[in-house]
Amino acid sequence: MLLELKDVVAGYGDITAMKGISLSVPEGSIVTLIGANGAGKSTTMKTILGIGKASKGTVSFQGKGLKGVKSYQVVQEGISLVPEGRQILQNMTVQENLELGAYQRNDDRIAADMEKVFTRFPRLKERRRQYGGTLSGGEQQMLAIGRAVMAQPKLLLLDEPSMGLAPLVVQQIFDVIQDIHKEGTTVLLVEQNAQKALQIADYAYVMETGKIVLEGPAAEVAQNPQVMAAYLGGHKASS
């Protein structure tokens, strides 16, 4: 198993956002974690990366426990996060943001990988000298994904990548996620856009108020009556 959480409890101050969460991400898969705002999804991502700390339970990556491991060391292990809200460096150029994604690398593929990002996102190439803060929301999301991919992750964490984006841009972002997966990167996707997430995922977890309330193959979860009513507007997710 590439990533495994067992009975993880975590939160902030007096707030417990994860109440005994267990989930697994097999290598080569796309796994999605869906749920309403405030369910604890982002806390789960931060806990995996070491930004948040688990008070109970274990997080392991490739069989290695991550307790006490610093965030930069988690990145070295092969996990990258595209955070909620993009969080690009607005006073740095597009190219500088991408270079920062590769800051722990020391190989001769960095320039080629940057060109690959520019091929995937032509608008970023056109704006490579522009500051991140001048980009549109969609372009900033492209940059956030490109920055994460520059780290050559084995596991890519995406936290609400479609948030606040126009439908056409959302489709482009999900197409890119699938392309990255096809190239060999495992994906854990947190999304409120359950329909899009369930369309591309292999396996799905549904999170409510800090607990996993449902899990299964994504196609089966998409047909669950409760999921359809709560997240899909009463309709099945089309493939």
Predicted regions span which residues?
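Glycine-rich phosphate-binding loops of nucleotide-dependent enzymes
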Residues: 1-239
